[in-house]
Amino acid sequence: GEAVGLLKADICLDSDIAHLILKPHPWRSLKTRGSQRAVPLISSSLWAAKRLLESNAGGPFCFPRYTNEERCNANSASAALNKWLREHTEEGCVIHSFRHSLRDRLRAVECPSDIVDAIGGWSTNSVGQSYGNGYPLEVLSKWMEKI
């Protein structure tokens, strides 16, 4: 549901490190405070973000079929993606599998768990993790480039 509610303005390609900003909007909230974050765009995610901006001319929304000023229909978007995945991937692969895969791939390169949580927007159990501004994009990007 996070991506479905994105505005084109939430995709930042003109900074030193291309990234997207996940933040609450009136049409889509986020689950936790940790869900609000900047996520570096690298490799295929950067390609997809550029393609999304190029192919989606009018209006402010990245996915206008599923989002408007009043609501974000993440369930319909998820159902459509899961249908496509059933037809094009191995059995059992669903859209949520990508979050599990991200965590597994970051673990495989020995990424520290607090950085994994920062990238994925997962909350941590440590009170100390909520202090400060979090990791800079350079650090997050360094780990994402390893996967």
Language-model-derived ranges and their functions:
Residues 1-2, 76, 80, 97-123:
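C-terminal catalytic core of tyrosine-transesterase DNA break-rejoin enzymes
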Residues 25-26, 42-91:
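Active-site/catalytic core of tyrosine-dependent DNA strand-transfer enzymes
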Residues 62-63, 103, 131:
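Bulky hydrophobic/aromatic "packing anchor" residues in well-ordered structure
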Residues 1, 5-50:
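Conserved tyrosine-mediated DNA breakage-rejoining catalytic core shared by Y-recombinases
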Residues 34-36, 60, 128:
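Short, solvent-exposed beta-strand edge segments and adjacent coil->beta transition regions
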Residues 35, 55-57, 142, 147:
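Extended, non-catalytic subsegments within catalytic or DNA/protein-binding/adaptor domains
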Residues 26, 46, 68-69, 113, ...:
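Catalytic-site neighborhood detector that most strongly recognizes the C-terminal catalytic loop/helix
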Residues 33, 95-96:
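Residue-level marker of regulatory loop/turn positions in helix-turn-helix DNA-binding domains and
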